[in-house]
């Protein structure tokens, strides 16, 4: 594994942990409802952008929750910048990860 790839993996894990913490304890957006968990974070090699994959459970309106996350991305980014020491704090792009929901659906069928 190249040195840069190992660093990317470490930063991805730190981003995942920190964004999870912010979503759990600090985010106060009324649109973000249900249980939102970060399943994966993937930062670009230039550290300018990070795709954050989230799974949303127990939410009546997944679209509204995703909209709330996108609206709050600036706040989340600022909190990440305070707690993770990076030269460039990446712009956060939230994507819905429905693999957990899909897995639960398959389990119920079996």
For the regions a language model picked out, list residue spans one by one.
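Charge-rich, low-complexity N-terminal segments
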Residues: 1-49, 55-110
């Amino acid at each position: 594994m190249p040195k840069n790839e190992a660093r990317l993996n470490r930063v991805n894990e730190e981003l995942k942990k920190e964004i999870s913490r912010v979503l759990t304890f600090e985010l106060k957006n009324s649109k973000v409802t249900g249980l939102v968990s970060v399943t994966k974070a993937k930062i670009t090699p230039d550290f300018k952008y990070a795709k954050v994959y989230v799974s949303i459970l127990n939410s009546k309106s997944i679209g509204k929750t995703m909209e709330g996350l996108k609206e709050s991305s600036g706040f989340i980014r600022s909190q990440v910048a305070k707690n993770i020491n990076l030269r460039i704090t990446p712009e956060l792009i939230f994507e819905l990860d429905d693999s957990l929901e899909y897995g639960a659906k398959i389990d119920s069928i079996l």
